[in-house]
Amino acid sequence: DSVFTYVMHGLSVPVSEEGAPAWGYTVPHLLVIGSFKDEQDMFAWSKKMADVDCTIPNQAEILAEIAQGAKSDKEKIANTFAWVQSHIRYLAYEAGVSAHQPATPAETIRKRYGDCKAMSLLLKTLLKAQGFDARQTDIGTDDIPYTSHEVPTISSVNHAICTVFYQGKPYYLDATNSYIPLGYIPTNIQGRQALVEEGEGCRVYTLPTLPLEACS
């Protein structure tokens, strides 16, 4: 085994300015590449980490609540999204394995809070229980200056959402945004590449950049 030591002297303190891009775009930094061959290899690891018990003891009650007032399957998807947004508080506690492995859906419901991985897994579980094609999705926000294809490491992916395909169209659901409705995409992931679960692997999708009126 080899040990590499990097020593830097006389570095100036980065200046943070309002409206400036994230530090990764402007500040020199070391990037540990890791051992993944490509984004498929990295997603396989992520999917394995997300392979937890998805049993929800009171699932029938939750689904009955979600179905109330829904007149179409699309409204059921919207209600499911809204249920997770309103019942689960976004709180990222990332220490040890929890930085990469989501809590079980049952535990997330019990605690009433979860990080992006836990919330997206709960959303995926509830949608799949209703027969929808919901999939795990790993993505890097606009804070990251490189894509998972360019740099297949966990440094290029810092967020998790759920993608549901309905009538041939992908809907990107980020439940960490408490009030965003179905069909809208948070600004920080618009135009970003996402690794969307497909069979045993993943497919790379580029999220759309919405017009200004759809972001207000």
What role is predicted for each listed range?
Residues 1-93, 97-98:
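Secretory-pathway-linked proteins and extracytosolic
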Residues 49-53, 66, 70, 95, ...:
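Hydrophobic alpha-helical scaffolding
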Residues 51-57, 102, 128-131, 173:
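Extended non-catalytic domains of envelope/secretory-pathway proteins
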Residues 56, 73, 77, 109, ...:
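Active-site-proximal structural scaffolding
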Residues 61, 96-103, 140-145:
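Short, conserved phosphate-binding/catalytic loop or strand-edge motifs used
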Residues 75-79, 83-88, 100-114, 118-134:
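Active-site-proximal cofactor/substrate-binding loop regions of enzyme domains
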Residues 118-207:
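Hydrophobic/aromatic-rich core segments of domains that either
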Residues 212-216:
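Amphipathic hydrophobic-ligand
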